[in-house]
Amino acid sequence: MKLAKSPRCWLAVAALSSVFASAAPVSSNPPMPANNPAIFYYEGRCDVTSAGDVRWGFPGVTAHLRFRGDALAVKIEAAEDDLYFDVSMDGAPPAILRAGKGVADYPLFKGDKVGEHTIALTRRNESWQGTCTLREFSLGATAGEWLSPPELPKRKLMFIGDSVTCGEMVAYESSRDMRAKLNSNARISYGMLVARRLGAQCHLVSYGGRGIIRDWQGIRDTRNAPQFYELALPDDPAVRWDHSRYVPDAIGIQLGTNDFNQGIPDQNEFINAYVQFVEKVRRDAPQALIFLMDSPIVNDEPGRGPRRAVLHSYLEQIVVRLGSPKVILAPLPRYPGVPNNGHPTGAEHEAMAGELEPLLRRVLGW
């Protein structure tokens, strides 16, 4: 079992079309390995391999970089088809990069002249939708130069959760299949939205379908939150995360949706497991504010019991049990999502961020 090495987590990218759908190499100067911490800053959990590649598995991981040149490309190995990235350059609205299964070079930017650019490359997909490996970045054949990457914010947030925290369905469009991977976009999830509003870094430690004690199907012997929280890559138990690499100022936990999917879980079991998990998180970040959020999906429905009311009651009891001013409840309303899918929409993620922002500003003094 190994600990993940973590260069400062962020890189960069940009584009002129809305979707890069095919791989195409860019003529370049000698490529720069993706693990160079003087050139690339990474935000989010990642693992550096012995070969110097940088692997991502959690949603929202972002690479930040700056360069002077007229072209930029990245070599990516995707474990699955349809891995999507938002490519943001110089503050412009992002373009979308699609990576297909396997190894390929992808153009990120091609300009008419040499210029200085700042780029961010962000993983959109949920955790279960496949790991991606960044191998190297390349400048164009014309004169190019790597510049020091942009400094990351000093403030640090972390959000632990399920598919809601991943940003599932946040980018859904009615013309698109509800199962399409393009519907996910961690960059505009509530956690990353509120982090940008507060001028903070953001780590999303989240996995769709998982809970505190059981997943959405009621399965207990899978990697639920207490297990995947310890990992650099959510589906690789051999790669442990070194919590000293990133110590948040505040940690939001939104869990319970999947625990309650098969019915109301036993009170003592759920509360005890949740308390133990928060205590572990507090040991890793002793000074952090921890705020427990209601599920925006769980609802009181005829035939399914008062699930929302019970979950809220459990959370209240957890806060009392922990007995610390640094552990608080952050109430959230229910959001209906779209017909036939209860995940919050993009507008509803904006609303959740709007609920959390004033609370965090007040409690953190930000």
Model region roles, listed by residue range:
Residues 2-4, 10-15, 21-160, 164-186, ...:
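N-terminal secretory targeting modules
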Residues 58-61, 101, 127-132, 170, ...:
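Conserved SGNH/GDSL esterase-like catalytic core that processes O-acyl groups on lipids
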Residues 101, 164, 209-211, 297, ...:
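Residue-level detector of flexible, active-site-proximal loop/helix-junction positions
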Residues 147-150, 236-247, 279-285, 362-366:
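Surface-exposed acidic, glycine-flexible loop patches that form ligand/cofactor-binding
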Residues 156-160, 165, 202-206, 249-254, ...:
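Structural recognition of the beta-strand scaffold that forms the well-ordered cores
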Residues 165, 199, 203, 256, ...:
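Sec-exported extracytoplasmic/periplasmic mature domains
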Residues 265-290:
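Glycoside hydrolase catalytic-domain groove-lining segments
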Residues 289-296, 307-341, 346-366:
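Extracellular serine-dependent O-acyl
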